[in-house]
């Protein structure tokens, strides 16, 4: 890989984005393949059956946007925001993700991918999705509210996470990865601290499947370039085919960041920061992988990180294999209370705070 270049081959410009109109019906339904979303909810339809698909009918006891009271905005992104909302009757809190559709086909594809995965996934280690709607150019997704925020929020409060707590966090994330990798054949492709959410019950859940990839089989490979550059595996950055082992690399970086309190890749000593994202990703591809300092951490943790961040993905362990690692099991008999830790760390979001 050439210094300062993101890919070893000449960059190919993507085709011009197509109009958003290809995703909309005259009745105001957002569609992509078998997926249909409108003001009444979401459904998947059979494309093999002749004729128009049946209308979307609201389910009994279905959540609706009219039932929700907006409390405050708890997250912002380039295409929308996440609001804390409360059900007017039950007083239960939810997170409402509101996305403004634009004219880019890639945005529409990402939204439909997230909706499709949310609709079909049932796992206690993934953030639950309760309902989705499309109306007046907005996609609204009602999600489980994780009142502790994200691991990124936790790190801002505590600086570093001790090994016993990190082991418990790791076990929960690995169980989520086992589900998406082996049961659903999904590569997350954007695993990072801000996409791992926590709550006062000590739960840790994976969220944000907007750039995920659904494979045809567990042995299939992907080749598209999406996600957050710093947490990308070397094979993804270099444009090679990749598998769900790319998520394992990202997990290793996340855990090492939580343990040390800083991102594993640091700029050269004479620099205060990376001059560009290209310099950083070049270092990820060209330099030796990061490691946990053996004088600061247990042999079990150092071994676990090493098995996650092997440069060759064939040398990385799978999520199932890592669940059997000594680091994941070494604190099982100890009094590791994630619920108390998350609460004592002061990371909980006060729902009604100004």
Curated annotation (Swiss-Prot):
Domain of life from the UniProt record: Eukaryota
UniProt keyword annotations, A-Z: ATP-binding, Immunity, Innate immunity, Kinase, Nucleotide-binding, Phosphoprotein, Plant defense, Serine/threonine-protein kinase, Stress response, Transferase
Gene3D superfamilies per the UniProt record, alphabetical: Phosphorylase Kinase, domain 1, Transferase(Phosphotransferase) domain 1
Traits of the deletion mutant: No obvious developmental defects under normal growth conditions. Compromised in resistance to both virulent and avirulent Pseudomonas syringae strains. Reduced sensitivity to abscisic acid (ABA) during germination and reduced drought tolerance of seedlings. Simultaneous knockdown of MKK1 and MKK2 results in dwarf and small plants exhibiting a seedling-lethality phenotype.
Tissue: Expressed in roots, stem, flowers and siliques.
Up-regulation conditions: By wounding.
Activity regulation comment: Activated through serine and threonine phosphorylation in response to wounding, cold, drought, salt stresses, abscisic acid (ABA), hydrogen peroxide, bacterial flagellin and laminarin beta-glucan.
SMART domains documented for this protein: S_TKc
Pfam (any one): Pkinase
Catalytic activity entry: L-seryl-[protein] + ATP = O-phospho-L-seryl-[protein] + ADP + H(+); L-threonyl-[protein] + ATP = O-phospho-L-threonyl-[protein] + ADP + H(+); L-tyrosyl-[protein] + ATP = O-phospho-L-tyrosyl-[protein] + ADP + H(+)
Catalytic site: 190 (proton acceptor)
Residues with PTM Phosphoserine: 224
Consequence of changing residue 97 to R: Loss of kinase activity in vitro
Binding site for ATP: 74-82, 97
Enzyme's top EC category: transferase
Protein EC: 2.7.12.2
GO biological processes: defense response to bacterium; defense response to other organism; innate immune response; pollen-pistil interaction; response to hydrogen peroxide; response to molecule of bacterial origin; response to water deprivation; response to wounding
Post-translational note: Phosphorylation at Thr-218 and Ser-224 by MAP kinase kinase kinases positively regulates kinase activity.
Positions of post-translational Phosphothreonine modification: 218, 228
A GO term for molecular function: ATP binding
Protein kinase domain location: 68-328
Subunit (UniProt): Interacts with MEKK1 and MPK4. May form a ternary complex composed of MEKK1 and MKK1/MKK2 and MPK4. Interacts with P.syringae type III effector HopF2. Interacts with MPK11.
Recorded family membership: Belongs to the protein kinase superfamily. STE Ser/Thr protein kinase family. MAP kinase kinase subfamily.
Function summary: MEKK1, MKK1/MKK2 and MPK4/MPK6 function in a signaling pathway that modulates the expression of genes responding to biotic and abiotic stresses and also plays an important role in pathogen defense by negatively regulating innate immunity. Activates by phosphorylation the downstream MPK4. Acts redundantly with MKK2. MKK1-MPK6 module mediates abscisic acid (ABA)-dependent CAT1 expression with H(2)O(2) production and response to drought and salt stress. MKK1-MPK6 module is also involved in sugar signaling during the process of seed germination.
Protein name: Mitogen-activated protein kinase kinase 1
Organism: Arabidopsis thaliana (Mouse-ear cress)
């Amino acid at each position: 890989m050439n210094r300062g270049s993101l890919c070893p081959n000449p960059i190919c410009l993507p085709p011009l984005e197509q109009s958003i109109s290809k995703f909309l019906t005259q009745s105001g339904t957002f569609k992509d393949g078998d997926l249909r979303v409108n003001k009444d909810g979401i459904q998947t339809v059979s494309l093999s059956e002749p004729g128009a698909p049946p209308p979307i009918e609201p389910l009994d006891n279905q959540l609706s946007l009219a039932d929700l009271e907006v409390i405050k905005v708890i997250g912002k992104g380039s295409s929308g925001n996440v609001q804390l909302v409360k059900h007017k009757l039950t007083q239960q809190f939810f997170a409402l993700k509101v996305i403004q559709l634009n004219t880019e086909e890639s945005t529409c594809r990402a939204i439909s991918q997230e909706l499709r995965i949310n609709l079909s996934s049932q796992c206690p280690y993934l953030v639950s999705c309760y309902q989705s709607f499309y109306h007046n150019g907005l996609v609204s997704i009602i999600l489980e509210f994780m009142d502790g925020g994200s691991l990124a929020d936790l790190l801002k409060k505590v600086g570093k996470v001790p090994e016993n707590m990190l082991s418990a966090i790791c076990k929960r994330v690995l169980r989520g990865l086992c589900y998406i990798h082996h049961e659903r054949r999904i590569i997350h492709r954007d695993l990072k601290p801000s996409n791992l959410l926590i709550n006062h019950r000590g739960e840790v859940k994976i969220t944000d499947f907007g750039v995920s990839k659904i494979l045809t089989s567990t042995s299939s490979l992907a080749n598209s370039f999406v996600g957050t550059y710093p947490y990308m595996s070397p094979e993804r950055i270099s444009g090679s085919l990749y598998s769900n082992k790319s998520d394992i690399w990202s997990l290793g970086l996340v855990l090492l960041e939580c343990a040390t309190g800083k991102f594993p890749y640091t700029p050269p000593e004479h620099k205060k920061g990376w001059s560009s994202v290209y310099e950083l990703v070049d270092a990820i591809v060209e330099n030796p992988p990061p490691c946990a300092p053996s004088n600061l951490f247990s042999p079990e943790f150092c071994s676990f990180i090493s098995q996650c961040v092997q440069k060759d993905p064939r040398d990385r362990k799978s999520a199932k294999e890592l669940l059997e690692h000594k680091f994941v099991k070494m604190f099982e008999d100890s009094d590791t209370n994630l619920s108390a830790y998350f609460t004592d760390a002061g990371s909980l979001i006060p729902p009604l705070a100004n």
